[in-house]
Amino acid sequence: MAKKKIAISCGDIQGVGLELILKSHKEVNAFCEPLYLIDGELLERANQLLHNAYETKTLNALAIHSPLPLLNSSTIGKISAQSGAYSFESFKKACELADSEEVDGICTLPINKLAWQQAQIPFVGHTDFLKQRYKEHQIIMMLGCSKLFVGLFSDHVPLSAVSQLIQVEALVKFLLAFQKSTQAKIVQVCGFNPHAGEEGLFGKEDEKILKAIQKSNQTLGFECFLGPLPADSAFAPNKRKITPFYVSMSHDVGLAPLKALYFDESINVSLNAPILRVSTDHGTAFDIAYQNKANNKSYLNAIKYLA
C-alpha cells in the first residue's frame, strides 16, 4: 500500500518547528511521504544552528513564494513579522495542495500569533483561517490523544465573550457536527458556570447547554451527550472511564486538564473540514529553540493520525 503524501507547513522558523522536522524526518518518512513547505536554504541554516546534527539532503522541500526571513543566533526565539509572513505562506500553500488533492493531508507546525499580527495577517491562527476559507463547513478545534479528546465550542476568543456565544441552536449545530466527525457514542459536555450553574443559581448559560443536549440527543435518537457536567469534576478518573470524548464551552476549561494529563502526546485536529489537517498541541517554544531539547512526541502522533 502506497504511503500517504503529507504536506508539512514549517511554522515559525524562530521556534522549534525546524528542529522537529530535522530530528524526526527518518521516523516521519517511515509513516508517510512528507513534503516540507520551506526553502531548503532555511533547513540548512537551521541545521547549522543545531550544530549540523542532522542530515538534510534527502528532505523533499518545496520553496515558498515569500521573502526568506533572517535565521541566525540573534533572531531565534524572537517575534518577527517576516517569520510570521513566511509561516502563513507555508500554511496557505499546504491548504492549496490539499484542496487540489496533490497531498492527502496537512500537518502544521506551531506559529506565533503575534508574528502573524505584525505581518498584518488577518487571521488569529490556523483554525481561524480554515473557518474563513471553508465557510460552508463548521470547523471544530479538537485536541487530545486516544485517551482523551476535547472539542472546543469556542476557541481563541476572550473568556468575557463566551457567555454570549452560548445559544441553544448554535450549540446544537456544534454538538451534532462534533458527533458526526468523531462518531462518538458518548460525549460528556462540560458546564460553563461553577457547579454547572446549580439550577440557575450561578447563571443561565447551563440551562441553554442542557436544552442543546436534549435537542441533540433527540435528533440523534440516542443519549449521546451527557451533561452539563460541573467542569471541576468532569475529568475525574471515574468520568474519563465513561468515554474519551468531551466538549468544553471555553478554551482553558477543556485544555487545562488535557495538557496536565497528556501534554507531550496530544495533537490538534480540525474536525469537519474538507481537508485533513492536524497540528502539534504546543506552541513555538521560543525559550528552547535550537537547543536540541524539543520533544517530538506530539508531532509524530500528528503524522501518525494522518498516515
Curated annotation (Swiss-Prot):
Binding site for a divalent metal cation: 156, 195, 251
Record's keyword terms, sorted: Cobalt, Cytoplasm, Magnesium, Metal-binding, NAD, NADP, Oxidoreductase, Pyridoxine biosynthesis, Zinc
Catalytic activity: 4-(phosphooxy)-L-threonine + NAD(+) = 3-amino-2-oxopropyl phosphate + CO2 + NADH
InterPro entries: PdxA_epsilonprot, PdxA_fam
UniProt enzyme class: oxidoreductase
Keyword Chloroplast: no
Localization (cell): Cytoplasm
One Gene Ontology term from the biological process aspect of the record: pyridoxal phosphate biosynthetic process
Gene Ontology annotations for the cellular component aspect, listed alphabetically: cytoplasm
Binding residues for substrate: 126-127, 259, 268, 277
An annotated Gene Ontology molecular function: 4-hydroxythreonine-4-phosphate dehydrogenase activity
Pathway the protein acts in: Cofactor biosynthesis; pyridoxine 5'-phosphate biosynthesis; pyridoxine 5'-phosphate from D-erythrose 4-phosphate: step 4/5
Main location: cytoplasm
Task of the protein: Catalyzes the NAD(P)-dependent oxidation of 4-(phosphooxy)-L-threonine (HTP) into 2-amino-3-oxo-4-(phosphooxy)butyric acid which spontaneously decarboxylates to form 3-amino-2-oxopropyl phosphate (AHAP).
Database matches in HAMAP family: PdxA_Epsilonprot
Similarity comment: family membership: Belongs to the PdxA family.
Oligomeric form and interacting partners: Homodimer.
Stated name of the protein: 4-hydroxythreonine-4-phosphate dehydrogenase
